[in-house]
Structure formats: structure tokens, C-alpha cells
């Protein structure tokens, strides 16, 4: 990307709506409630022929440094300092406030390029607010409607003028290089069923989920080594899913911080419902999901439901018992947590559970290695030959039950997909195979092929009867 743009302004002027318009997706939560956005949200923007990196920010307010609003303001000021250009958004419908004027003074003092944007200019009575914006001393405002997409060409022209043509349209040698495509030849006789090598160079998507105030944002900040995400004693600070990238041992990790998930009965406000829906999208987009527990009050009903949700979505799961520095008797608590994990999460037998402390950094290396190891299992493929030898063995040890006096027969097994591992078994009368025997097969696969902590799916298919066609011809 050629340059970075920060969208700034006071709360509820339409910054997130403009962000969504420029990235072409509804990435940021939008609501009439002021102050929905709290963390910096990055994205890749497309505006006519411009391509640039964009950052949505929290609404700027006058507040003390030790308050939540003050910490939000500090995050926004970091975004302004790191950006090449700021889009200063004002509400043309409502007009200017003393906060707008204070923000204009702050932007002028920083000495960086600013484009003044008069949003909601399609509204009746917005002319007064548009002309008032001239008094801010930041040049001619660009009238737009972020909601309806009006004024986008004028905004593009203003950005090019502010940043400069050379910066806006740099020559990119990568555009030529990307056209060179090398096709890998197919080797005759190659066995595509054998276990495939794990690609440890591919970027890994990890979602961090859990109850409110479990320490999710603190954990990510510790990984990054900076206060990138808002944290504090207040529950529910994070409202929408924020993605951040960092490097771990040469591998790109894309982490998604998410809003805390409360019990459904307690989720009343529309905004919180939007936040939970955003968290569900992050889970579905991720490959591995870390469920953060508060080790001082672990295994509440909501914790179990979150783990169950992650597994039902087919994601790889790792448990992180956070705030371990506050646990008084670590050895006894660890033994208790392991026992509860096995008893309360039978569907995730062998799931990796790591004691850690986001505040101090304790256990982070082990947690990250557990994430990588679990992702390897989630991507695991097993050859058909190995599976059928295994199927014969487990049936010898524990044959399928007889139903109505007739023994069930499992004839053939193959892996149909990975991510998560899914298997198809050809058998007689698949509808008659009891759930208990499917659990036996699932647990056997997990133990014999070393697949802890990931969902395993088994599909039963009726085997073809070679005499069926002969009966029909008669």
C-alpha cells in the first residue's frame, strides 16, 4: 500500500460508515449510539483508482487520561501520528461543536496533511454546517454522504491533492511480478492420499474469544509488545472484532480480538447483539480459536457454551487459563482444571489447556506453541490405507453391535476433508449404527492418530449391494 489514512472526528459523525464505504465491506460496527468504535481498526481501502491503507478510530472527546474515553483518545492520537494523512470528519447536519474546534487545533499542531470531510451533506439543513466548517482553518471541506456514497470522487481528488500524485500513484514492480505464474507439474504415480506436509509458512488466523473481562485484549497486547488494544477494569470494553498482525518465529499471525460473550439472556441491547454477531464472524473466519478463561473463576456455564460453539463451528480450539498470577495454589488449581476439562468437555478430549498471565507474560510461549500444534492437527490428513488398517483393528477389538439379530459391518473408510478432519465410512445400514459406537470410533481416531482438541466428524454411507440391480431386473 502506498500510504496510510486515519479517519478521525468526534463520536457519531459517521467515521465507521465512511470506513465501511471505503473498504467495500461492513467491517466496522455502525450504530446510532455514540462511541461504538473504541480500538483502531485497519483495512484496505479502494476509492476510484486509489488504493491505500485506512484506519478507523474512536470518536475523539475531551477526557482525562485515566478514563476509558481518555485511553480511547490516546489510541486515536497514535493512529494520527502513524498515518500519512487524516480525514477529519464533521457532521454537516448537526454543525460544529467546541470538540470539533479543539480537534482541528490538535490536527493543525501536528503539521500533517488533513482533508476536512463534511459528512451527512445530503440531509436537509446541512448547508449551514458545511459553511461553518470553513472556519476550522483546514481548507475547503469536501461534502459527502458516507451512507449513500455521494461525493466519493471529490473525496478522491482531495486526497490526491493533499498527499501528492507521486505518493498516491507509486510505480509498483510487484504488479509485473505477480503475472508470472509457475505451474507445478503433476508427477505420475504420486500418492495424494499420504499425509501431507504441514505448511508452517502460511499466515495463521487466530481468534481470541471468551467472557467479558477475561483478559483477551491484554493477552494480545502482550503478544504484540505494545498497548495496541484498549484494556481496563471495565467489562465489555471491546465491542467489535479487531484484527492485528505480528510475527512469531518467522510466521505471520493474524489475531482477532473480539467482544466478550455473555449469556444470551443477558444480551439485551442492540449494540451488544451486533458485537456478539461480529464475534461469531471472527470465529468462522479463524482457523484456530483461543478461548480465554479467568482462572480465578473458571468453568462458568458460559465458558462451556463458548467452547461448544467453537467446536460446532469446526474450529481448532485451545484453552487459555488467564490471570494465573492471581491463583494462590497453582498446583492444586491446575489439577482441578485438568479434571474439569476432561469431565465437562468430553467432545474435546485432549484439548490443550495452558495456564498463562497476560499481565506478566507468563505462559505465552507455551500458549503460542499450543496454537501451532493444534492447527497442525486441524490440518491433518491420513492415508486411506492407514485408515482401513485401523478400521479393521478397532472392529476386531470391539465389533459393531448386532441390530435385530444382524451384525453391522463397517467396510471401508477414507478421509474426505481436513480443517477439521472429516471421514466417510461405508457400512451396512448406516442409520442403525448407535451414537455410542460413533463416539468409540471418534475417540479411537483421536487417540491412535494423535488428534487432540479438534472436532472430528464421521459420516456414514450405505455400502452398495452388488445384488440390488439383479433383484430389480427380476
From Swiss-Prot:
GO biological process: ribosome biogenesis
Domain EngA-type G: 3-167, 204-379
Residues that hold GTP 2 according to the record: 210-217, 257-261, 322-325
Tagged with keyword Hydrolase: no
Alphabetically ordered keywords of this record: GTP-binding, Nucleotide-binding, Repeat, Ribosome biogenesis
A Pfam match: MMR_HSR1
UniProt-annotated binding residues for GTP 1: 9-16, 56-60, 119-122
InterPro entries: G_ENGA, GTP-bd, GTPase_Der, KH_dom-like, KH_dom-like_a/b, P-loop_NTPase, Small_GTP-bd
Coiled coil spans: none
Keyword Nucleotide-binding: yes
MF terms in GO: GTP binding
KH-like domain location: 380-464
SUPFAM superfamilies linked to this entry: P-loop containing nucleoside triphosphate hydrolases
Family classification: Belongs to the TRAFAC class TrmE-Era-EngA-EngB-Septin-like GTPase superfamily. EngA (Der) GTPase family.
HAMAP family: GTPase_Der
Assembly and binders: Associates with the 50S ribosomal subunit.
Role description: GTPase that plays an essential role in the late steps of ribosome biogenesis.
Protein name, per record: GTPase Der
Organism whose genome encodes this protein: Allorhizobium ampelinum (strain ATCC BAA-846 / DSM 112012 / S4)
Gene assigned in the entry: der
